[in-house]
Design a protein with these regions (language model features):
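Low-complexity acidic/polar repeat-biased segments
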Residues: 1, 636, 845-888
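Beta-strand elements within well-structured catalytic alpha/beta cores of enzymes
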Residues: 8-21, 34-36, 60, 121, ...
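Short, structured active-site-proximal loop/turn typified by the sulfatase FGly-forming signature C/S-X-P-X-R
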Residues: 22-71, 75, 127-131
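Secreted, luminal/periplasmic, and some membrane-associated catalytic domains
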Residues: 50, 76-83, 88-104, 292-307, ...
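His/Asp/Glu-rich, glycine-adjacent segments
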Residues: 65, 72-247, 252-266, 420, ...
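Acidic, His- and aromatic-enriched active-site or binding-groove loops in soluble protein domains
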Residues: 66-69, 145-201, 271-288, 329-372
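Polar, surface-exposed loop/tail segments
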Residues: 452-486, 546, 564-599
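Acidic, glycine-rich calcium-binding repeat modules characteristic of RTX/beta-roll
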Residues: 643-844
Length: 888
C-alpha cells in the first residue's frame, strides 16, 4: 500500500493504563460508556501476554507481537549491565534513561527493531506527540529518547513532543545513576506551557505504596494527570491546529493502574482488593482526562477529522501472597517458610521464584539490582542472597549459580539462571542452558502450587508440561535476549457464584507490593481482558464488534485510516480491524481453539485458549487445569457421530462431536458442538459455540440467565433468550438465523451473514442484522441496526425505538393497524430508496411537521416517528407504504 496521507485525518490513541473491561459503566466512567453507545465497542478484546505495560506499549506503538519487539515484560534480562539502572542486567524499563541504554546496544539505536506509528507518521510530515506515563510514552517513538554521547550524554530535543513524569523543559538535569534524565522540550512548547499557566516540569505523582503494616494511597493520581491533560488541550493540540498539519498523538493515562497498584483500601485482605473506592477513583480520573480531550476536539471541530481509539494495556488483579485459591489454602513454597523484614509470616516475599529455584537446585543466589551505582561498571559483584538469614532480592530478580559477577559487560559464564520478576508472571533465562536443564527447571516449576502454565523457547524442543513460546507470539524477530521460559502464576476468583469472573480475579504475584493491592501480568482473563473502544469519522456508530481484537491491532487500524504503509522487519503483526470501519464488513469470521501440552510426570499440562481471525491469533487465557480464571479445558468430549444426551455440572466444558446432540447446561459452562443439528439449554456465565448444523440454543430456559454468549456458527440456527436477569450476547454468524429475546433487557443480538430474523419482546435491547436481507423486530426502547442488504425494521407497539437501516433499500414499519405508544426514531432514512411503512393508515391522516433538521410524522396528536436529517418538503407519497405489513 502506498502512502496516501491525503484524507486530512488525525488520530489519537488514548490508553487508560490497567482499565478492566468490566469497570466501564455509566456512573464511574460516563465518557467511556458513552463511546460504547455512540462508537465502536470491542467486546472481545485482548492484552498481549505477558500482560504488562511496556510489552503492550510496544505492541500499541508498532502493531507487532512481542516476539518481534523483544519487549517481553517491564523487567527483562538485557545481557549487559545498564548504567542507568546501577549496573543491573535485569533493569525495570519504565524509565527513559534505561530505554536509552538498551537502544544503544541494538541496530538503529532501536531495541524494538520495528517502526512505530508515531515515528513513521513523523517521517511523513505529521505532527506527533506522546504524553503521560513514564516509559510507555517514550516507547511510542523510542529513538527520540536516545542520548548524544552515549549513556552519559544528554537527550537532544526530540521532534516528537514527549511529556512524561521526568520532562522538565529546555534544561534537563544531568544524568543521575539509577534515575532518568529529563526529556527536553522545544522552546516553543516551553513558552506555550508558561503562557497557559503551566510549569515546564510536570506535577509529580504522590501515591505512596505503603508496606506490610501501613496502607498505601487513598487518592487517585489526579493532580499529575490534570497537568498532562492541560498540556495536551491547552498547548499541544492548539499548536497542532495552528500548524495545519495532520497529527498523531498518544495520551497515556497512568490511572487507574497507579491507583490500583498502590491503593490502601485492602491491606493484606483479598476483598475489596482493587474493587474499592481508591481504584474506582482512579478509573474515574482516567475517564475525566478522556472527557477533557474529547470536549476539546468537539469544541474546535477537530472531532470531524480525528479518529480516537481507546485501549488499555492490560487488565488487573488483586494480589495474593499466601492464599492460592478461594478457600484460603496456603502456599507450600519454601520461600514462604522463611522470615523476612517487611514480609508477613507465611507470605511469599518478592523474589520467591528465585529463592525457590536456588534452594531446589542447591545453587547460590545473587541480587542483580544494586541499590547504588558500582564504582566500576566493568567489574560488578552482585550481593549474595541467603533466605535463611532473612535476605531476599530487593526487586525480586535473581541470578542463580556462578559468582554473581559482571566482568567487562559479561555476566559470569557460570550463571545457570536469571529470573526477571515482574508480577503475575516471570521471565526465566538460561544463559548456558540446554534442553535437559530446561526440562529439569520445568519439572521443578510444575510442582509449585503457585504456577499455572509454562512456556518454553522453541529452541529446546518439546518439553512435557510446557507449550512453545511460538504458540503465544513470543518467538519472532526480537533482538533482545529471548526468555528460555515464561511462567504464569495462579489466578482465582473471589466471586462465589462465578469462578471465572475477571472482575474478581486474584493472582499470585512476584512483586514488592502487598497482598490486597493490585498487579497484572498473568494469563488469567482478568488480566488479558482489557478495554478497547473507538469513535470518530472513520469508525462505525453504535457497533459492537464480537470478533477478537488486541493491542497489536491498534496501529494497523490507524495506519489504514491514515493511508500509511509502515515498514516492518518481523512477521508477527496485528490486523486492521476493518469490520469496525465505515464501509467495512459487518463482521469477520473468527474461530476458537484449545491447545494443550503433554503432561509432566506429576500430571500437569499447559492449556492455551486462543482465537483466530485469518492468520492473526488472540490469546485469551492459559495455564494448568483449574488454576487460571477464564481458561477452557475440556471436561467432557464426544468424538463420535452418534446423538448424545448430556447433562453438565456447573463450570464444565464440553465438546459434543458431530451427532445431533441434546445438552442440558448449567452455570459457567463452555460448550462446543459439532456438525449435527444440536439443541443446547444453558444458564448464566456460559459460552456456547455451535458448529455447522441447524442448531437451537435456549438461554435462561430453566432460570433467568446473564453473562452468557451464544455463537451459532454455520447453519440456520435459532438462538433464544427465554428469560434474562442481566445482559447476554447472541451471534448468528453464517446462515439464515433467528435470534429472539422473549424476556430481557440490554440483550445484544448480531445476525451476521445470511438473511436473519431478530426479535425483541423485551426492552432496551440492541439488534444488529449484519449482511444479508434481514428482518428486525423491536418492542420498547430498542435499537435496531439493519446493516448491509435490503432490510425490514419493525417498530413495536411500545414505541421509543431507534431504527437505523444501513446500506441497501430498507423498510421501516412504524405502525400496522395500531399506533405506537411513543415516538420512534429513524436515523438514516434515504428518500427515494427506503420506505416508511404505515399499515392500515391513509395518507390523508398524516401530518408532516418540520422540527429543526428532522421531520415528525404524526396522526392527530400522536407522533409516530422522527426522521432525522430529513426535510418534510422533500418527502413524497412514494416514500410511504400504506398497505398491511409484509409480515402478518
Amino acid at each position: 500500500m502506498a502512502n496516501t496521507n491525503g484524507n486530512g485525518r488525525n488520530v489519537i490513541i488514548f490508553v487508560a493504563d490497567g482499565l478492566r473491561n468490566g469497570s466501564v459503566n455509566p456512573i464511574d466512567t460516563p465518557t467511556l460508556y458513552s463511546i460504547r453507545q455512540q462508537g465502536v465497542t470491542f467486546a472481545n478484546s485482548h492484552s498481549l501476554f505477558p500482560t504488562f505495560t511496556t510489552p503492550n506499549a510496544s505492541a500499541i506503538a508498532t502493531g507487532h507481537y512481542l516476539g518481534d519487539t523483544g519487549d517481553f515484560s517491564n523487567t527483562i534480562y538485557t545481557g549487559f549491565p545498564s548504567p542507568n539502572a546501577n549496573g543491573s542486567v535485569t533493569p525495570f524499563i519504565e524509565n527513559d534513561a534505561v530505554l536509552g541504554d538498551i537502544d544503544e546496544k541494538f541496530p538503529g539505536n532501536n531495541f524494538l527493531d520495528e517502526e512505530s506509528l508515531l515515528a513513521y507518521a513523523r517521517s511523513q510530515g505529521f505532527n506527533t506527540a506522546a504524553v503521560g506515563k513514564l516509559g510507555p510514552v517514550a516507547i511510542q517513538d523510542v529513538t527520540q529518547v536516545n542520548r548524544e554521547g552515549g549513556t552519559t550524554g544528554t537527550i537532544p530535543t526530540p521532534d516528537t513532543i514527549i511529556i512524561d513524569d521526568t520532562t522538565n523543559g529546555a534544561t534537563p538535569p544531568p544524568t543521575a545513576a539509577g534515575s532518568p534524565s529529563g526529556v527536553p522540550l522545544d522552546p516553543d512548547i516551553v513558552n506555550r506551557l508558561q503562557a497557559a499557566g503551566l510549569d515546564v516540569k510536570p506535577t509529580p505523582r504522590v501515591q505512596p505504596a505503603g508496606n506490610n503494616t501501613t496502607p498505601g494511597t487513598l487518592n487517585a493520581n489526579v493532580a499529575q494527570q490534570q497537568y498532562f491533560a492541560d498540556a495536551t488541550t491547552k498547548v499541544i493540540l492548539p499548536k497542532f491546529q495552528e500548524d495545519g498539519k495532520p497529527f498523531a498523538l498518544v495520551y497515556w493515562s497512568r490511572d487507574p493502574d497507579g491507583s490500583q497498584h498502590n491503593q490502601g483500601d485492602s491491606l493484606n485482605t483479598l476483598t475489596p482488593g482493587i474493587n474499592g473506592p481508591t481504584s474506582k477513583a482512579g478509573v474515574k480520573n482516567a475517564d475525566n482526562n478522556l472527557k477533557q480531550l474529547l470536549d476539546y476536539l468537539k469544541s474546535t471541530g477537530l472531532d470531524k477529522t480525528t479518529d480516537v481509539i481507546v485501549t488499555s494495556d492490560h487488565g488487573f488483579s488483586t494480589i495474593s501472597k499466601q492464599a492460592i485459591d478461594s478457600q484460603g489454602t496456603k502456599t507450600t513454597s519454601y520461600a514462604a517458610t522463611q522470615t523476612y523484614e517487611g514480609v508477613n509470616p507465611g507470605f511469599l516475599p518478592a523474589g520467591f521464584v528465585a529463592i525457590d529455584l536456588a534452594h531446589d537446585l542447591g545453587l547460590p543466589l545473587y541480587d542483580p539490582n544494586p541499590t547504588t551505582l558500582p564504582p566500576n561498571l566493568n567489574q560488578i559483584q552482585y550481593a549474595t542472597v541467603d533466605a535463611t538469614k532473612g535476605q531476599r532480592p530487593i526487586s525480586g530478580n535473581g541470578v542463580i549459580g556462578g559468582k554473581g559477577q559482571v566482568i567487562n559487560g559479561q555476566l559470569d559464564p557460570g550463571t545457570k539462571i536469571v529470573v526477571a520478576a515482574n508480577g503475575g508472571s516471570d521471565l526465566i533465562y538460561l544463559p548456558n542452558g540446554n534442553a535437559n536443564f530446561a526440562k529439569q527447571v520445568v519439572d521443578l516449576l510444575s510442582q509449585k502450587d503457585y504456577i499455572s502454565g509454562i512456556f518454553v523457547d522453541d529452541a529446546y524442543g518439546d518439553i512435557p508440561g510446557a507449550l512453545p513460546l511460538s504458540a503465544i507470539g513470543l518467538k519472532g524477530d526480537a533482538k533482545t535476549p529471548v526468555p528460555s521460559l515464561v511462567i504464569n502464576f495462579k489466578t482465582f476468583s473471589t466471586d462465589p457464584s462465578n469462578p471465572n469472573n475477571p472482575q474478581a480475579q486474584v493472582e499470585i504475584a512476584d512483586t514488592t507490593l502487598q497482598q490486597g493491592q493490585g498487579m497484572h501480568g498473568s494469563f488469567g482473563r482478568g488480566d488479558t481482558f482489557n478495554n478497547m473502544e473507538a469513535i470518530g469519522p472513520d469508525f462505525k456508530q453504535g457497533y459492537v464488534d464480537y470478533a477478537p481484537v488486541s493491542n497489536a491491532d491498534v496501529t494497523p487500524t490507524l495506519a489504514r485510516i491514515l493511508g500509511l504503509d509502515i515498514p516492518s522487519n518481523g512477521d508477527l503483526k496485528g490486523r486492521a480491524i476493518t469490520e469496525a470501519l465505515v464501509g467495512g464488513p459487518n463482521a469477520v469470521l473468527s474461530t476458537k481453539q484449545v491447545l494443550t501440552s503433554e503432561e509432566t510426570t506429576n500430571g500437569q499440562a499447559t492449556t492455551l485458549d486462543y482465537q483466530s481471525v485469518g492468520n492473526t491469533q488472540y490469546f485469551t487465557a492459559a495455564g494448568f487445569d483449574g488454576r487460571t480464571v477464564g481458561l477452557t479445558t475440556l471436561d467432557l468430549q464426544f468424538d463420535s457421530t452418534s446423538s448424545d444426551d448430556v447433562a453438565l455440572k456447573p463450570n464444565q466444558t464440553l465438546f459434543t462431536g458431530d451427532g445431533a446432540d441434546f445438552v442440558e447446561g448449567n452455570k459457567g459452562n463452555t460448550i462446543f458442538t459439532g456438525k449435527g443439528n444440536d439443541t443446547v439449554v444453558v444458564g448464566s456465565s456460559s459460552s456456547v459455540f455451535t458448529g455447522d448444523g441447524n442448531d437451537q440454543v435456549l438461554i435462561g430456559a430453566n432460570s433467568p440467565a446473564n453473562n452468557t454468549s451464544a455463537d451459532g456458527g454455520a447453519g440456520n440456527d435459532e438462538i433464544t433468550v427465554v428469560e434474562a436477569n442481566g445482559s447476554n450476547n447472541l451471534f448468528g454468524a453464517a446462515g439464515n438465523d433467528t435470534l429472539t429475546v422473549v424476556e430481557g433487557t440490554r440483550q445484544l443480538s448480531f445476525g451476521g451473514s445470511g438473511n436473519d430474523t431478530l426479535k425483541s419482546q423485551g426492552s432496551n435491547n440492541r439488534l444488529y442484522g449484519g449482511s444479508g436481507d434481514d428482518k428486525l423486530f423491536s418492542n420498547v426502547n430498542d435499537s435496531l441496526f439493519g446493516g448491509d442488504g435490503d432490510d425490514v425494521l419493525f417498530a413495536g407497539l411500545g414505541g421509543g425505538n431507534r431504527l437505523s437501516g444501513g446500506a441497501g433499500a430498507d423498510q421501516f414499519w412504524i405502525a400496522n393497524a395500531s399506533l405506537p405508544a411513543s415516538k420512534n426514531i429513524v436515523t438514516d432514512f434515504a428518500e427515494g430508496i427506503d420506505k416508511i411503512g404505515l399499515g392500515g393508515i391513509s395518507l390523508s391522516n398524516l401530518r408532516l411537521l418540520q422540527q429543526g433538521a428532522d421531520t415528525i410524522v404524526k396522526i392527530g396528536n400522536t407522533e409516530l416517528v422522527s426522521l432525522q436529517g430529513i426535510a418534510s418538503t422533500s418527502l413524497t407519497v412514494n416514500d410511504f407504504v400504506f398497505s398491511a405489513s409484509i409480515v402478518a
